[in-house]
């Protein structure tokens, strides 16, 4: 948890000040401002733990337990050894510099461990308007200074797993090198990163692009200079290291060397061709440069690869690949040397997606290799490791694959691999979803198994598309990129599983029925299967709907206020509506394809839409829409709008662009007219939360620019005045996808970020409340029935669902279910219920929203657990003093 500082500056907003003026004009000619209040908030993440690609892990070579991780869109992190967690370092990055949350490289200074550097920038094409920068810190990332570069950097571009592109000279730590993309060559600083100049003597800026024909500029960009490695044996303290190796994205000329501290350079003679060198790691003690090669830049692709060893004294090259070239269907990338035992080398098959990634290990400098898993008799395999993902149980993806696939997988996109330079037993590696690690790695060599588990707590890297906070049930439901989304029954615990049945790769939109919050709908992207799903138990369980013809993506979706009908605006076809749960769809009339859709939160027949500056209204359940007469709204589609819970026809709309109308609008007549709020220079999201104690109108939240300041704002008086609730240390880059308050906790706000997960804030004064807690300690009487199902099982772990049915004649107002495991099973995490354990006996109690169970009704909860030996089912379940029947 991090606490913001109370802002001391107050700015004033005059009514009507510059209403409708474009933000560019405001920036050029700032007007006087007054009285914009600020509040002190505490901020933390709704825990997911990971959720995105970690392309780089860097250990400091001279200070034990000092390590950093970089992400492609979610900033950089420092390892906290005492808690085994990661601390975010770039939350200060603001709206205008959002691209600086993409980190292309991190360098930790081995001479002065307090110094750390980050090369930042997300895209090299026009998706990111800003140039890259090098950030420098003298306090391990607590604070930063920035040097802007004359070119862009690509933390989320193809080739981002190669590296490290940024390096500090281990002898003269005022000297740094940076490998640039896009043909900009090699750059050097001689004043500890304050200023930079191109190394004009370096002969090759690279020429490899993933897809030269890509007109967007994303895949067609030259991946440039990919890594810099110093030979520390060729220097002394205070003088620049003489021998420097540089990797280049050029399949014929992938490695260069300087032996005069960068004055001159030459192509390394005798090197292999036809591949890109993803990594170059030097073992100065034995005089070897190890290189991991792939036929592409990754991180997704790569069909062939090799490992080579270069003898720095003789110039001899040796192919040390653990697999014959003809047998590779993957490239190599992750590469590390055990600094305590430099003859020990490890590498990853980063692009082996099926059946799993592979990790190779050699203890004789690449002479012979063993691998993390191997086939016994296909498709059966034997692992040298065990995996325990009980701390992040969703990493199983709810899957039950056929051999040789296993769940959880060892990984994919495994381009970051590092052995702790002070501890041969500790290794960390990044995947497309998490950081895994072990602290008994040398078991590998003794023939016993080493234990892998997530080492990712504190690192939150999901991109958030939508958020809802229902008035009952789970406090938060999220729609996420890559991992689909979660039902967050607790904000401080990792959810057990992402949404499944179906499991969207990306959930694009999410809604619930305001008057019946158990009914939830989501839409999203899926290669094969439906693009829409429904839940009747507040998102705990799901079932897929049926797609209308032509659907290619999730789009936006809205649930009627009573949950009886839905309107869907998917990609690939026009707006559709249905009664029931999406078994049959009909085309809506009067509204264009691609419109954003939402529902009125009171009238179940009223739905709203927006497209290209026009607001649309349907009063017949989405069958027909009529264009509103409202004018002056944003002309583009960069708009989010919502209807107020409990306020029929009360609609708020945020959005726009710098070259046109931009701000926040309010309608009280169902969208027939809108009034633009004065003083809100720009706004991109709007949401609602519990009213303040002395207010009659719900609290408003927005990600906006107000009073010339970008931030997260709160209003308790219907938008008349605004309070900034974040500060400059907590900005999280781009926050324009979604925002919502909490209808049960005054002041709480959930903010969608583009790579830092879901952050939520509470008032520091203590009004923020806590997570909705469990209900009373109940012992209901009456008949009961239990259905116990093991839904997934893996080595050492399992997942189970429990369905408890009231078969009596009286309603329960709270319940408490007891059972005893017959073996050594232990519950590690439970959702939709609170649990306690004494030995092997477990008690599961209701939470507040599922305490009431009518006769004939059921309640379901689930859990993950650990086991060894056998995983037999409990023989009986008891509700108070009554033994339940079994289904």
Set out the residue ranges of the language-model regions.
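Extracellular glycan-interacting surfaces
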Residues: 2-771
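Extracellular low-complexity, O-glycosylation-prone Ser/Thr/Pro/Gly-rich "stalks"
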Residues: 767-887
């Amino acid at each position: 948890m991090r606490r913001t500082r109370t802002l001391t500056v107050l700015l004033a907003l005059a009514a009507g000040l510059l209403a409708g003026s474009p933000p560019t004009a405001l920036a050029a000619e700032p007007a006087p401002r007054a009285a914009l209040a600020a509040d002190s908030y505490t901020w933390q993440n709704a825990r997911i733990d990971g959720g995105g690609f970690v392309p780089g892990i860097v250990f400091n070579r001279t200070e034990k337990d000092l390590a950093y991780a970089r992400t492609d869109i979610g900033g950089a992190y420092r390892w906290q050894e005492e808690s085994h967690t990661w601390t975010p370092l770039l939350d200060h990055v603001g709206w205008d510099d959002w691209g600086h949350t993409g980190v292309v490289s991190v360098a930790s200074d081995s001479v002065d461990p307090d110094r750390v550097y980050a090369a930042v920038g997300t895209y090299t094409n026009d998706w990111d308007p800003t140039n890259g920068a090098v950030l420098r810190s003298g306090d391990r990332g607590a604070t930063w200074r920035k040097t802007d570069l004359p070119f862009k950097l690509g933390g989320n571009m193809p080739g981002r797993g190669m590296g490290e592109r940024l390096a500090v000279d281990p002898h003269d730590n005022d000297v740094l090198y940076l490998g640039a993309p896009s043909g900009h060559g090699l750059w050097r600083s001689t004043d500890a990163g304050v200023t930079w100049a191109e190394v004009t003597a370096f002969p090759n800026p690279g020429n490899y692009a993933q897809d030269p024909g890509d007109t967007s500029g994303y895949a067609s960009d030259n991946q440039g200079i990919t890594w810099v490695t110093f030979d520390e044996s060729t220097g002394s303290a205070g003088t620049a290291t003489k021998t420097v190796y540089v990797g280049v994205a050029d399949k014929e000329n992938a490695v260069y060397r300087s032996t005069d501290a960068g004055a001159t350079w030459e192509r390394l003679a005798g090197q292999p061709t036809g591949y890109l060198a993803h990594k170059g790691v030097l073992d100065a003690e034995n005089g070897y440069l190890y290189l991991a090669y792939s036929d592409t830049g990754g991180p997704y692709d790569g069909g062939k690869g090799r490992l080579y060893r270069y003898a720095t004294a003789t110039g001899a090259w040796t192919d040390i690949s653990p697999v014959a070239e003809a047998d590779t269907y993957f490239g190599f990338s992750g590469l590390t040397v055990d600094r305590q035992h430099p003859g020990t080398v490890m590498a990853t098959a980063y692009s082996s997606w099926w059946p799993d990634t592979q990790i190779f290990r050699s203890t004789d400098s690449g002479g012979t290799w063993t691998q993390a898993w191997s086939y016994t008799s296909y498709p059966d395999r034997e692992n040298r490791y065990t995996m325990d993902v009980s701390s992040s149980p969703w990493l199983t993806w709810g899957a039950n694959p056929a051999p040789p696939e296993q769940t959880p997988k060892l990984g994919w996109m495994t381009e970051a691999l590092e052995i702790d330079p002070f501890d041969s037993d500790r290794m960390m590696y990044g995947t497309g979803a998490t950081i895994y690690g072990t602290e008994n790695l040398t078991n590998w060599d003794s023939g016993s198994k080493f234990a892998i588990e997530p080492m990712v707590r504190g690192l939150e890297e999901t991109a958030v598309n939508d958020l809802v906070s229902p008035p009952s049930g789970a406090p938060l439901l999220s729609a996420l990129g890559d991992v689909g989304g979660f039902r967050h029954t607790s904000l401080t615990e990792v959810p057990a599983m992402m949404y499944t049945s179906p499991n969207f790769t990306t959930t694009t939109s999410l809604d619930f029925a305001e008057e019946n919050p158990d009914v939830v709908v989501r839409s999203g992207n899926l290669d094969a299967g439906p693009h829409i799903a429904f839940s009747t138990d507040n998102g705990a369980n799901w079932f897929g709907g049926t797609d209308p013809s032509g659907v290619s993506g999730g789009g936006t979706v809205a649930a009627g206020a009573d949950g009886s009908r839905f309107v869907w605006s998917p990609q690939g076809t026009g707006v559709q509506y249905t009664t029931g749960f999406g078994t049959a769809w009909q085309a809506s009339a009067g509204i264009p394809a691609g419109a954003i859709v939402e529902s009125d939160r009171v009238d179940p027949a009223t739905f709203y839409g927006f497209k290209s500056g026009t607001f649309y209204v349907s009063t017949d359940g989405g069958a027909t829409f009529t264009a509103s007469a409202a004018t002056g709204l944003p002309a583009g589609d960069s708009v989010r709008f919502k209807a107020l819970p409990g306020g029929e026809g009360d609609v708020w709309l945020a959005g726009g662009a710098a070259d046109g109308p931009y701000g926040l609008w309010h309608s009280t007549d169902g969208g027939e007219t809108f009034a633009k709020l004065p003083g809100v220079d720009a706004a991109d999201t709007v949401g609602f939360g519990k009213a303040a104690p002395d207010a009659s109108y719900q609290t408003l939240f927005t990600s906006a620019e107000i009073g010339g300041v970008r931030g997260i704002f709160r209003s308790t008086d219907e938008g008349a005045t605004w309070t900034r609730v974040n500060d400059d240390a907590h900005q999280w880059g781009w926050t324009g996808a979604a925002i919502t308050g909490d209808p049960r906790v005054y002041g709480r706000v959930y903010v969608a970020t583009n790579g830092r997960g879901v952050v939520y804030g509470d008032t520091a004064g203590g009004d923020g409340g806590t997570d909705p807690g469990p209900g009373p300690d109940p012992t209901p009487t009456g008949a009961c029935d239990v259905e116990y199902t093991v839904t997934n099982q893996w080595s050492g772990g399992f997942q189970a669902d429990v369905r408890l049915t009231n078969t009596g004649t009286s309603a329960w107002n709270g319940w408490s279910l007891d059972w005893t495991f017959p073996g050594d099973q232990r519950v590690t995490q439970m959702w939709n219920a609170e649990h306690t354990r004494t030995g092997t006996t477990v008690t599961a109690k209701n939470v507040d929203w599922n305490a009431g169970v009518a006769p004939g009704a059921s309640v379901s909860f689930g859990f993950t657990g650990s086991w060894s030996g056998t995983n037999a089912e409990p023989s009986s379940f008891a509700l108070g003093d009554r033994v339940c029947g079994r289904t």
